[in-house]
Amino acid sequence: MACMLLLAACDNYLDIQPTGSVIPNSLAEYRALLARSYKDVSKFSDRGMACFRSDEMQVRDNEYDQNYYMDIERWNDLAPNAYTSSFEWAKYYNVLFIANHVIESRSDIKEGTEEEINQLVGEAYMLRAYVHFLLVNLYGQPYTKEGALDTKSVPLKLDTDLEKVLKRNTVEEVYTSIQADIDEARKLVMKAEWEQRYSYRFNAASVEAFQSRVSLYKGEWQAAWDAAEAVLAVKSVLVDLNDAAATLPNSYNSVENITPLETPLSLSLIHI
């Protein structure tokens, strides 16, 4: 009996919410949680830095740029300069954790309609697919390269288990997971368009736009075409470049944008 009382007391103690912490329960709280992940994704600039390792960009001959980017350009990963900018792969996995938490909590989300909850979870599937897509293309072989499908790329993270030891998955396994998440998102994301202040969120057109990009990277030309046509059927407006006052496509509020989520180049890279 004493043991039972002790266990009950422990359960009650563990149920206490720590002061100053927020454990999401409502739709609004889960939406705020996902909004933080959207913000993190918007700051990813690793692809911009990766351009130093191709013929797209060259580090300028000044002390500042040399300190931060020269060893990236030279592929010096073993003993880089202490000031060398780092690739932020860990932040990608932070976003994956939040996306997984929203997906796993689908049946526990309160104070929202089924449609609103489905939309939120669908966006989480899209975030998970998109982040895995970025990772596999930064750290894996191109999908269409001969023999690439069986090569190791990045670990898939599909749950919130922090104790699980992750192992690298093959390029094919990562792309299979990406496609599965897109398929789930397609069933859940029904929002046609968000008002401008929420335009960073995924909508139905962005699901098909991402599908087109994934198919393109896989060399599935017809599938890429079909998905692109589905997007153009609902979003085909172009910026009039003859208008001096036109908002260019690189702006988040351009009429061409579908989901203005990311900035592939950070401000520190723009003028290099």
Predicted regions and their residues:
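Membrane-proximal, proline-rich intrinsically disordered regions
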Residues: C10-S54
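Hydrophobic-face positions in mid-chain alpha helices that act as interaction patches
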Residues: A32, G219, W225-I270
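Conserved, well-structured interaction surfaces
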Residues: Y69-Y139, N169, K187-V189
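Inward-facing hydrophobic residues that define packing positions of alpha-helical scaffold repeats
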Residues: L96-A99, Y175, I182, A228, ...
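Short coil/turn linking the two alpha-helices of tandem helical-hairpin repeats
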Residues: V136-Y143, E193, G219
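Short coil/linker segments at helix-helix boundaries
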Residues: L138-T176
